[in-house]
Amino acid sequence: MYNSLSALPYIPYNILVYLAHQEVAEDLWKLLKYNSYDALSKPNLTFDQKLELIWRNGPQEKFGVFFTPLVEDAICESKCVLKIYDYYIHAKELYNSTVVYAFDFLYGGQMSLVEYNGVPVSRGDLFINKAMAVLNGAEVGGVGKLTFLDDMSRYALGRATIGNSKTFTGVQLFLAVNVGDTGEEYGCES
């Protein structure tokens, strides 16, 4: 009985629920929900409004949060999209693996800037700043905490310019957490 990664399917949702409960993440939700330059001056979302942004099935254009790297019909040119998914799984030992989660934050070129503390800033830079402030060190259902640390994974990084470079752009942030268990018992002996 070795690591079966039993917590793996739940971690993206756990991350989102954690973000929805954190008061310090309100600006992050506003960046996602409101497309305007003054997005941060808009009202906070309720917990239910935040979770209603999650796409579950069917047409995607009404939603802003996805647990898959493939988003087929959510139009990034006209709104912000957040994708949270496991990017890389590295087996460290029999009972423990490092899982790297990707956070893709996409938005149209016309909404690239927001006002923050009276100055124009990059929506992508502010997303990375707010995500790091809330998630770096968060308990999300793994073994230990979600971290931005090269010692945990060489994939822990942030980078700009994802998208099609013509009508939408964005940023990517990679955070890692250990996931492990003693597995589920299968085999000839069971």
Please describe what each predicted stretch is.
Residues 1-93, 190:
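Small/polar-rich, solvent-exposed N-terminal microdomains that initiate assembly or binding
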Residues 45, 71-82, 109-146:
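Acidic, Ser/Thr- and Gly-enriched intrinsically disordered low-complexity segments
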Residues 75-76, 90-97, 162-168:
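Short, solvent-exposed beta-strand/turn "edge" segments of beta-rich domains on protein surfaces
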Residues 82, 99-103, 171-173:
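Hydrophobic residues positioned within well-ordered beta-strands of beta-sheet architectures
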Residues 88-90, 105-111, 176-183:
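Beta-strand elements of well-folded, non-transmembrane domains
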Residues 96-115:
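Short acidic, glycine/tyrosine-flanked loop/strand segments centered on an H-E-D-like triad
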Residues 121-180:
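Acidic-leaning, charged glycine-interspersed low-complexity segments
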Residues 183-185, 189:
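Aromatic/basic-lined ligand-recognition segments
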